Amino acid sequence: MPLFTLPFLGMIELEIAPKYWHLKAPHVELPSCSQDTLLSTLYSFDLYLEVPLSSDEREVLALLSSARPEFTAVEASLFRLSVWRAITTIPLGETASYQALAQTIGNPRALQAVGTAVGANPFVWVVPCHRVVRADGRLGNFALGSTLKASLLLWERRVLALR
């Protein structure tokens, strides 16, 4: 199985099966996905971090695809789009609560709907929903697992400290 390294996850193992691809990382929950989803995620992750992929990562991508995948169109309500847009305004290394997002979009009573919209975010690396936390500061849920959410926030703070 191909191995490569991501900045904050360490060594990653890629398991390739007929109907799914799965990234295995120590102490991190990563869901199985299609080849296109995996490649889109890795490429958008590269853009999101503004850090070039390592030679190992590029080698894996070269094995998987000869061309950069296209993002598929996503249908979403205006409400969800407004939540996702608001998430993109949360600065690197900072967090905002679901309540703050609801207020930002002008619908302060829509906490549950905001949470649903955050959870439905199909662009995890582009719309940084890992920056959304509970009002009491606890991390809350994350599509790729709470360990990865904590790692992303810690990594962002370290990046800021280096600037």
Which residues fall in each region the model found?
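Short, proline-centered helix/strand-breaking motifs
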Residues: 91, 122-128
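Residue-level signal for inorganic ion chemistry
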Residues: 87, 101, 129-130, 152
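Pre-recognition alpha-helix immediately N-terminal to the DNA-recognition helix
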Residues: 82-86, 113, 151
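…primarily DNA-binding HTH/wHTH and HhH modules…
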Residues: 135-163
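Regulatory, non-catalytic segments
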Residues: 109-124
